Amino acid sequence: MTFMAIEIPEFIVPFVPWIRGTVGLVLVGAIFLGGMAAVWIERKLSADIQLRYGPSRVGKFGLLQLVADAIKLFTKEDVRPGNADRFLYDNAPVFMLTSLFLMLVAIPVGAVFIDGNLYPLAVTEMDISILFIEAVSAINIFGIFMAAYGSNNKYSLLGAFRNFARMIGYEVPLGIAIVSVAVMTGSLNIIDITSAQGSFVWNIFLQPIGFVVFFIALMADLGRLPFDQNESEEELVAGWVTEYTGMRFGLVFFAEYMHMILGSFLVALLFLGGWNVPAFVANNAVLGLIAPTGILLLKTVLVLMTIIGMRWAVPRFRIDQVVDMSWKKLLPLSLLNLAWAVGLGLYLGA
């Protein structure tokens, strides 16, 4: 049997889907634990930037602070506004987490090399996985609308309107940047896009403009500084999450950090070579099992730390500046990059 152009011994054939799916699910569970780790990383990194200690009293390096925060969230009173729409208010966090679950189905979270052959670790493999990821990530906005409208609060609704304006403007260049990578590779499968980059010919070098456009648009999609106009504390209290407390707030908070981690994975897979390692590593019996996933996770953590560090490096933009930048700067740059990708793809294909 041939699997992804790889010859697989016949006795393994019946177990290939189960092995990949099981390992993929285990890594997906590990990524959820990574959502908690991302909170600790942000606290420590922010403290380092501000010349503070950060969490240091609860356990070694403050690691048990996460447990303390979880206990606090579990024990806080869950207050629902009296005039809220119960169905929309209660189900908005679940809707947002569902979007993240669907993204995790298609994103490969690692890979192994056995006898030099590549075996990506993903729950499933889709020929149009990159379009699927883009589509299900965009439906997160409906969860935000449900939370804002269901809260029946003016600050929540104003925060959601700002979120709509920002996401409409930045989803377009984000999508074009993804299409540019797919056009040059000749595939909509994120596994093929990652594998095509090889060990050193990463898309960040072939499409530097596309990388800049994608990263800025991703930051806007995440709603991180300088693009957090939807929850600017000085103007809108907490934006569309103003009325959320207890575990419902915890779910929204967790979804935000999970979105950050998945966005970091996409940057690493699409532009930074993903799991690709030199041939001598791939052909090594031990390193081929460990190094690819380790390299991908290292790149993901570095991207995550960059996103977190941006919070303290740049000031918040006004909402009109954000909208102007998307339509007047990023959109033309993304179209220019698309033309470059088409030409480069034709040249490399020739």
UniProtKB/Swiss-Prot annotation:
Keywords, comma-separated and alphabetical: Cell membrane, Electron transport, Membrane, Methanogenesis, Methanol utilization, Oxidoreductase, Transmembrane, Transmembrane helix, Transport
Temperature dependence: Optimum temperature is 39 degrees Celsius.
pH dependence remark: Optimum pH is 8.5.
Subcellular location: Cell membrane
This enzyme's EC code(s): 1.5.98.3
Signal peptide: none
Catalysis performed (reactions): methanophenazine + reduced coenzyme F420-(gamma-L-Glu)(n) = dihydromethanophenazine + oxidized coenzyme F420-(gamma-L-Glu)(n) + H(+)
Recorded GO CC terms: plasma membrane
EC category name: oxidoreductase
Primary location group: membrane
Entry function: Component of the F(420)H(2) dehydrogenase (FPO complex) which is part of the energy-conserving F(420)H(2):heterodisulfide oxidoreductase system. The membrane-bound electron transfer system of the complex plays an important role in the metabolism of methylotrophic methanogens when the organisms grow on methanol or methylamines. Catalyzes the oxidation of methanophenazine to dihydromethanophenazine. It shuttles electrons from F(420)H(2), via FAD and iron-sulfur (Fe-S) centers, to methanophenazine (an electron carrier in the membrane).
NCBIfam families the UniProt entry points to: F420_dehyd_FpoH, PRK06076.1-2
Family: Belongs to the complex I subunit 1 family.
Protein name: F(420)H(2) dehydrogenase subunit H
Organism of origin: Methanosarcina mazei (strain ATCC BAA-159 / DSM 3647 / Goe1 / Go1 / JCM 11833 / OCM 88)
Gene: fpoH
